[in-house]
């Protein structure tokens, strides 16, 4: 495999990747006038922006070993799972909500896609800087609801996305299973959650729906990074996404009412979107007994624990008490006695108000 980076990706396009260059409709002369810049999109892939005199695009290539302090590996062909999800999302979301795939190099585990405006902002950076815009959370709630609703009961999507191997390698194992093994006090609820999660086949689940993968442009938010997509438990997306928002709230505890507002707005809009008749069967079951909502709360707790005790830990909870507060909060949620997500969100708000 030709491993690309910002220093050699143009050489790739001039040699083994020349067919990709041609598929992009670019001439040989444009190659010498092009530039390449590596983008900071997570730990599992190499992502490079290429600017040519004609157009800009992004190159993405998977890596077997992820860039984390603790050893973490995943299969290279997960990159094609991302291509599949991108193509499916083109049919479920408004134009421009996700990038369009432009070309694929199967031999080198690489594909190209549309580039986002160069002056975009990453929503994660805004949140870390203390900028809390609930309208972004509202837009994203609508998008996630459209994905979950639109893929429910779709046999073609279910068959295409049924395999959960990458989801296990990049989420269940390093997030849930690792914490269960290293923090025995959480082993029983986490192992139970793993079992129940793998048994669900409800809809398309992104499993990496987070602020770091939301790029803010003048035309609205654009969502990226889909290699963990699969047909499974929608509660994981809810818990994963809200875990990021609530961890940022812990960081900005001195402004808790403003910091927690996007989480409240997201849940309110998402729940409202899926309550429109006819609603997905898995949500209707949740009305009779709050299985979906309760399991979403468990995912919230498990994902927050994973970011303080798992293989991929946040680096922005810098006060010594913050990880312990997260653990105590999650321990409470994993008891199973909370049936409503807003109760869990408000519980954290009250804990932080007491600091």
Regions of interest found by a model, annotated:
Residues 36-59, 191-236:
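Active-site acidic catalytic loop and adjacent metal/ATP-binding pocket
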Residues 1-34:
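Juxta-kinase regulatory segment immediately upstream of eukaryotic protein kinase catalytic domains
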Residues 254-257, 303-355:
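ATP/Mg2+ or Mg2+-diphosphate-binding catalytic cores
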Residues 292-302:
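Alpha-helical scaffolds flanking conserved acidic
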Residues 39, 44-155:
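ATP-binding pocket architecture of kinase catalytic cores
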Residues 84, 235-281, 285, 300-318:
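Active-site activation/catalytic loop segments of kinase-like enzymes and analogous catalytic loops
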Residues 68-78, 204, 217-265, 320-324:
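Active-site Asp-x-Gly
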Residues 1-11, 114, 147-196:
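Active-site catalytic-loop/activation-segment of kinase and kinase-like phosphoryl-transfer enzymes
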């Amino acid at each position: 495999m030709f491993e690309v980076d910002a220093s050699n990706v143009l050489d790739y396009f001039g040699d083994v990747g020349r067919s990709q260059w041609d598929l992009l409709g670019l001439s040989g002369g444009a190659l010498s006038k092009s530039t390449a810049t590596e983008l900071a999109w997570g730990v599992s892939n190499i992502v490079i922006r290429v600017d040519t005199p004609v157009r800009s695009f992004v190159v993405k290539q998977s890596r077997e070993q992820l860039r984390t302090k603790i050893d973490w590996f995943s299969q290279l062909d997960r990159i094609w799972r991302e291509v599949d999800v991108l193509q499916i999302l083109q049919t479920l979301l408004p134009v421009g909500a996700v990038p369009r795939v432009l070309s694929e190099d199967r031999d080198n585990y690489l594909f190209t896609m549309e580039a986002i405006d160069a002056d975009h902002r990453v929503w994660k950076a805004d949140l870390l800087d203390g900028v809390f815009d609930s309208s972004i959370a509202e837009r994203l709630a609508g998008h996630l609801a459209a994905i979950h609703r639109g893929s429910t009961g779709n046999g073609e999507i279910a068959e295409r996305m049924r395999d959960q191997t990458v989801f296990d390698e990049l989420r269940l194992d390093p997030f849930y299973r690792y914490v269960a093994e290293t923090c025995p006090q959480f082993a029983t609820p986490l192992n139970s959650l793993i079992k129940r999660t793998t048994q669900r086949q409800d809809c398309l689940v992104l499993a990496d729906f987070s602020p770091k993968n939301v790029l803010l442009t003048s035309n609205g938010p654009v969502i990226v990074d889909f290699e963990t997509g699969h047909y499974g438990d929608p509660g994981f997306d809810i818990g994963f996404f809200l875990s990021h928002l609530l961890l940022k709230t812990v960081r900005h505890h001195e402004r808790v009412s403003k910091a927690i507002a996007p989480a409240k707005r997201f849940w309110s809009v998402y729940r409202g979107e899926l309550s429109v008749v006819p609603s997905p069967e898995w949500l209707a079951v949740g009305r009779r007994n709050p299985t979906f909502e309760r399991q979403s709360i468990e995912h919230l707790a498990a994902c927050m624990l994973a970011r303080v005790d798992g293989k991929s830990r946040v680096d922005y909870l810098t006060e010594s008490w913050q990880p312990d507060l997260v653990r105590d909060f999650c321990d409470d949620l994993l008891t199973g006695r909370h049936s409503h997500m807003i109760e869990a969100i408000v519980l954290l708000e009250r804990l932080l108000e007491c600091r």
